[in-house]
Amino acid sequence: MHIAVLGAGSWGTTLAVLLARKGHAVKLWAHRPEFARTLQAERENTRYLKGTLFPDSLEVVGDLDGCIAEAEMIVTAVPSQALRETARAFSSLPFQGKIIVNVAKGIEVGSGMRMTEVLMDELPGLQPGRVAALYGPSHAEEVAREQPTTVVASSPSMETAEAVQEVFHTSRFRVYVNTDIVGVEVAGSVKNIIAIAAGISDGIGFGDNAKAAIITRGMAEISRLALKLGGDPMTISGLSGIGDLVVTCLSRHSRNRFVGEELGRGRSLDDIITHMNMIAEGVLSSKAVYALSSSLGVEMPITQAVYEMLFEAKPVEQAILDLMTREPKPERD
């Protein structure tokens, strides 16, 4: 199959390599033409995925039109807040009939839209049954080294979800399917915010009790928002929910946990972001999800605390005190 992967960061590069290793003809699009030329010449992404060599069937290009033209499937792997701009750039190209698989995790600032909603908004000819999300506990560094990984392909159309499953599934990259794309996308987006909170706990020096509480109560927040938006709370117990939440809150590879840890140690957000090589999606997602939850009347205190620490300069100690001194209540409320 001819596949276009849009976005040459660590995850886009990893998936392009995985697909090429499986025998697909893959074009990896890089936003900056000079970066595309460097990757094509060096046959390795030393900036984002050092040590993973490109298979012969992987071509890196800077021409979006040429990348899309032959593709039967398009994988969008650009940062979540850049997805609208990218989709708009190929909205006039012949994408009809192609399956579009989004792998970026986030909620758009301003609109409060999930990533597949952004795609539908910018691509009027895109049918809901031709779009999918591929989410789950899947750090690029481990997938690139072919360490066992499981994810879920979700689409309103089971036929599309199964088509994505067939394209991506390998003996080291197991793909499940479901049709609850709302639950999958909400879980994959909010977990990054909860991971920032988990990182803050690490940075301050709190123990396992605090981390367990953040993960568990974070799951409750994800479930409440997913249910309000029409998702199935049971999805949160799956790979895109608890699976991705645990790995993002605990892993040394997690950018979002790293941001939180550095905040907990006293560094400013601006300083952390300036010196990071990659994007931590949870930072801007906290702004989008807090606004969305507030407008819907969904209580998400951990999300609110992260937002206030990141964007309202609320002291970490005060945010923790506010969380711990909230009115006592039943666990399932």
UniProtKB/Swiss-Prot annotation:
Q: Write out the pathway annotation from the protein's UniProt entry.
A: Membrane lipid metabolism; glycerophospholipid metabolism
Q: What does the organism's lineage look like at the top? A: Bacteria, Pseudomonadati, Chlorobiota, Chlorobiia, Chlorobiales
Q: Give binding positions for sn-glycerol 3-phosphate.
A: K105, G136, S138, K191, D244, S254, R255, N256
What's the main place this protein lives?
cytoplasm
Gene Ontology biological-process entries: carbohydrate metabolic process; glycerol-3-phosphate biosynthetic process; glycerol-3-phosphate catabolic process; glycerophospholipid metabolic process; phospholipid biosynthetic process
Kindly state which keywords UniProt assigns to this record, in alphabetical order: Cytoplasm, Lipid biosynthesis, Lipid metabolism, NAD, NADP, Nucleotide-binding, Oxidoreductase, Phospholipid biosynthesis, Phospholipid metabolism
The family database entries (NCBIfam families) matched by this protein are listed as: PRK00094.1-2, PRK00094.1-3, PRK00094.1-4
Question: What are the protein's GO molecular function terms?
Answer: glycerol-3-phosphate dehydrogenase [NAD(P)+] activity; NAD binding
The answer on whether this UniProt entry bears the keyword DNA repair reads: no
Reactions accelerated catalytically = sn-glycerol 3-phosphate + NAD(+) = dihydroxyacetone phosphate + NADH + H(+); sn-glycerol 3-phosphate + NADP(+) = dihydroxyacetone phosphate + NADPH + H(+)
Q: What is this protein called?
A: Glycerol-3-phosphate dehydrogenase [NAD(P)+]
Question: Where does it live in the cell?
Answer: Cytoplasm
Against PANTHER family, the record matches this protein to:
GLYCEROL-3-PHOSPHATE DEHYDROGENASE, GLYCEROL-3-PHOSPHATE DEHYDROGENASE [NAD(+)] 2, CHLOROPLASTIC
* A GO term from the CC aspect: cytosol
Enzyme nomenclature, EC number = 1.1.1.94
Summarizing the function annotation, the protein's role is:
Catalyzes the reduction of the glycolytic intermediate dihydroxyacetone phosphate (DHAP) to sn-glycerol 3-phosphate (G3P), the key precursor for phospholipid synthesis.
Family affiliation: Belongs to the NAD-dependent glycerol-3-phosphate dehydrogenase family.
Q: Is Lipid biosynthesis there in the keyword field? A: yes
Report residues binding NADPH: S10, W11, H31, R32, K105, A140, R255, I279, E281
The active site is formed by K191 (proton acceptor)
SUPFAM superfamilies (UniProt xref): 6-phosphogluconate dehydrogenase C-terminal domain-like, NAD(P)-binding Rossmann-fold domains
